[in-house]
Each structure stands twice: as C-alpha cells, then as structure tokens.
Amino acid sequence: MSSKGALIVISGPSGGGKGTVVKALMEMMPELGVSVSATTRAPREGEIDGREYYFISRDDFEEMIGDGEVLEYTTYCGNYYGTPKKEAERVTGEGRDLILEIEVDGAAQVKAKFPEAVKIMLIPPSLSELERRLRGRGTETEEVIQSRLARAVEEIALAPTYDYVVVNEAGDIEGCARKLIGIINAEHNRTCRMKEVIDNFTAN
C-alpha cells in the first residue's frame, strides 16, 4: 500500500456539527493528522503560535499565495485563513492521513491541486434540524441565523461535487464518526492506493 497518507477533506454548513464530529473522529483514530492553519488575525488570549494557528503578517501570507505555498485559503472578517502546503506535505509524508476541516471554497481548491483528495460533505438531516441547532447556540442574531441557513442551502447544493455525503443525525455523533472511519478505511483499499502491492506480484 502507498506509504503516503491521504488528504481527507471534511466540509459542511455552519451548525452541522463538523467540529464535534471531527473531534470524536480524532479520539477514535488518534493516528490521524490535523494540519495547523495560518492566519493574519491577531492571536487571542491563550493561543500559541504553531498550536492553534501560525500567526503571520498579511504581506507574508500574500507572498505564500503568490509562491504557491498555500494549499487552500479564504478571507473572513478581513483576515486570511489557509493551510500551508508544507504542513500538509509534512503530515502525509509521515504516512498519516490528514484531516482538513474546511469550507466548500477551500475544498474545491484542494481538489483542484490534489485530485486524489477525498471530499466528504457532512450535512444535518434537514434544514429544520440545522435551524434548531443554530438557535440552540443562543449566540447569534436572527439576521445571522437566516444568513447561515441561506448559506447552508448554497453549500449543500454543491454536494454532488463531493465523493461522499454523510448525514450527521441528531444525538449520534459517535455513529457519524464511525461512518467517516469506514470511508477512510475503504479509501485505503482503492486500486490506485494498492498499486505498490499489485506491482509486487507483477514485477517478475
């Protein structure tokens, strides 16, 4: 089997439970790698450079973009956020699968650069369930909730461009994480990833 790790891209609407499911996934499969993103925003209290993020200047980030050193990036509230290419190469080069929990725009960027990347969209069972989860946070205004719901519809419309779609059922975080594990394990048995093993039989 290929000694290089796979790029596993997980995205989905805000409030869909990505972060919670990915956390459960990492607890079940601690051998998975998670890349440290770079950002131009200032560190918050308690954040450490190289742990939560690599905190860099806007000029440095734009230079990385120009040099092709960013795997994917986006802007939010006037700041850049992105995955350094060398960070992804470091993790997969160690033979570990890399989990990228990113937005749909970033997922498309990764797939364009690495066609072998595995894209998984995590969605709620219904729009009404997503609305219930967003309201349950108790931290967002009505305007923000409606904006997130509209954005969710746009994002889920892109599901056909993904390799897999996984429904995050209410109250079944562990079950959802196990579905992701099944996908990851299946991906390791794809013919393209088993070329080394096959070649051992056909080399002579």
Language model: regions and residue ranges:
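ATP-dependent small-molecule kinase phosphotransfer cores
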Residues: 39-98, 104-105
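Extreme N-terminal, non-catalytic leader segments
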Residues: 1-7, 30
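Conserved phosphate-donor/acceptor-positioning beta-strand/loop module used by diverse small-molecule
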Residues: 98-103, 112-136
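Post-Walker A helix-loop "phosphate-sensing" segment adjacent to the P-loop in P-loop NTPases
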Residues: 27-35
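NTP-dependent small-molecule kinase module
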Residues: 139, 154-204
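Conserved lysine of the Walker
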Residues: 18
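Post-Walker A alpha-helix
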Residues: 21-22
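P-loop (Walker A) phosphate-binding loop of NTP-binding proteins
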Residues: 11-13
